[in-house]
Amino acid sequence: MKYVLVSGGVISGIGKGVIASSTGLLLKTLGLKVTSIKIDPYMNIDAGTMSPLEHGEVFVLNDGGEVDLDLGNYERYLNVTLTHDNNITTGKVYSNVIQKERRGDYLGKTVQIVPHVTNEIQDWVERVARIPVDQSGEEPDVCIVELGGTVGDIESAAFVEAMRQFQFRVGHENFVSIHVSLVPVINGEQKTKPTQQAIRDLRSLGITPDLIACRCKQPLEKSVIDKISLFCHVGPEQVLAVHDVSSTYHVPQLLEDKLLEYLKIRFALDKISVSRELALAGENMWSSWKHLTQGYDHLFKKVTIVLVGKYTHLQDSYISVIKALEHSAMRCGRKLDLQWVEASHLEASTNTSDPLSYHKAWHLVCSANGILVPGGFGSRGVEGMIAAAKWARENNTPYLGICLGMQVAVIEFARSVCGIEGAFSEEFDKECENNVVVYMPEIDKDKLGGTMRLGLRPTFFQPNSEWSKLRKLHKMVDEVLERHRHRYEINPAFVSRLEQGGISFIGKDERGERMEIIEKRDHPYFVGVQYHPEYLSKPLKPSPPIFGLVAASAGLLDEFIQSGEEVEWSNFSHFNAESALADMNDSVEVTEEATVVTIS
């Protein structure tokens, strides 16, 4: 087993997750089996009870694990299925150590950070690294370990010490350290001092980086690479320049030459036995990835989607939704133009308190090609979401509601079409007589952590739903598996009345009691799903519900359905520079003075 540690210095949020994912992707192109572990040095057991504004999106795994958003990156890049154990937190480690102490596993020893906590961390990494994560069902060859936060923070001290010891446990020949640092530009000059200091800090803790990934605005100058090489005691070939690019999908190509060449030699990868089947799959994956990124740069026609959410101040709160929209836009041959609307700005009260924000928000909603309302918790902004759903329904604007987004669409329909006065959700008004959304009876109302309906669960399309556009995108299957994260459901007592009003519950759970999918028949695309389709979307395999929204917004959905094509990429024949240039030529406006290219 080979291990790659990815750590960060200077500042957090520097792109360690993308670099870790890109490293894994490059190794997979060689036919190797790769897994990933994310270490989060916070005391929380998991990310389940954390606000998205505090830590970004809570990503949900097949087994119901509520984990850091970086595990979403790993799954998207590496096409693997991880478990909650692939996310290590201080809370989990300490909980395990305390349980062992209570059982007497330490035989009366004084329990300390070293060796007991550090050993627990190392044992965890070694155990999880051997769990199969792909379709081969075989033990991985390489494990990428990302250490969250910034080296030097007090929270990560035990994990850094554990990794220092771990490099000797597994052997130098099986362990590579990549340190990600920032190279800022001051007065037009790339500065290396922050990187030098970060490397000194890491060395003082016992870890010597093998590769230094330098995040920078522009490509690193040769003199800067030489300076980092000199003062950080690495060869110039061990300094990786990771400059800003148009899309994170380009990062693997930035790293390909230096990183892959170094790992091949250091890990003696040519000695690892790789089946012809996996080697060919790796080659095909890399070819597809390059075609995808090449085509992305030549997209000119836009599709405008407005996201009406509660946590728009931190876009990482919706990172999987953003990526899923990008995947679908690329599949449609469109450049995604994503506009953000704070849901509360659509509410009538905002017209009084902040009319500028109110009118700006409504202008974005009214001019969008499509509307997406994602999941969320709490009452803030809910009336704004309901207003957005009403606009989409009445004006034939393509709409997708995810989790809460489906619930607000049902509330709006109940009020406006079915005449259910005061229809609302038990989440926001427990005393309301007409709550069309209610608490699920099996859910613990007192304990928040890990008590929702979580993980991969089946949804069954109902009889007589053959007309459904969403079902057609799923190739008319009877059942789909999607990841869930919710406490509330559509009130079964109102289902019949809602269906009489004209909304169809085309998907239900295995018992036929829980409403999973809504769709409006006489609409270009009006769909709500109780699950979170964004969690399973991949660059080469977009999510059908989200693809449906983007395709309908681009005016391509009916044509796509009639063509019988798969949502998953089968080839890239229509996604290349030539077709993109044709699109661009279609949008060239000729005037007497000049030819103006309008990106529209």
Curated annotation (Swiss-Prot):
It catalyses: UTP + L-glutamine + ATP + H2O = CTP + L-glutamate + ADP + phosphate + 2 H(+). Residues 304-570 form the Glutamine amidotransferase type-1 domain. NCBIfam families: PRK05380.1, PyrG. The active site is at C403 (for gatase activity), H532 (for gatase activity), E534 (for gatase activity). This is CTP synthase. Keywords: ATP-binding, Glutamine amidotransferase, Ligase, Nucleotide-binding, Pyrimidine biosynthesis. Its EC number is 6.3.4.2. PROSITE patterns: GATASE_TYPE_1. GO terms for molecular function: ATP binding; CTP synthase activity; identical protein binding. InterPro entries: Class_I_gatase-like, CTP_synthase, CTP_synthase_N, GATASE, GATase1_CTP_Synthase, P-loop_NTPase. The keyword Isomerase does not apply. Pathway: Pyrimidine metabolism; CTP biosynthesis via de novo pathway; CTP from UDP: step 2/2. GO terms for cellular component: cytoophidium; cytoplasm; cytosol. GO terms for biological process: 'de novo' CTP biosynthetic process; 'de novo' pyrimidine nucleobase biosynthetic process; CTP biosynthetic process; pyrimidine nucleobase biosynthetic process. The keyword Glycoprotein does not apply. Gene3D superfamilies: 3.40.50.880, P-loop containing nucleotide triphosphate hydrolases (3.40.50.300). Pfam families: CTP_synth_N (PF06418), GATase (PF00117). It comes from Schizosaccharomyces pombe (strain 972 / ATCC 24843) (Fission yeast). Belongs to the CTP synthase family. Catalyzes the ATP-dependent amination of UTP to CTP with either L-glutamine or ammonia as the source of nitrogen.
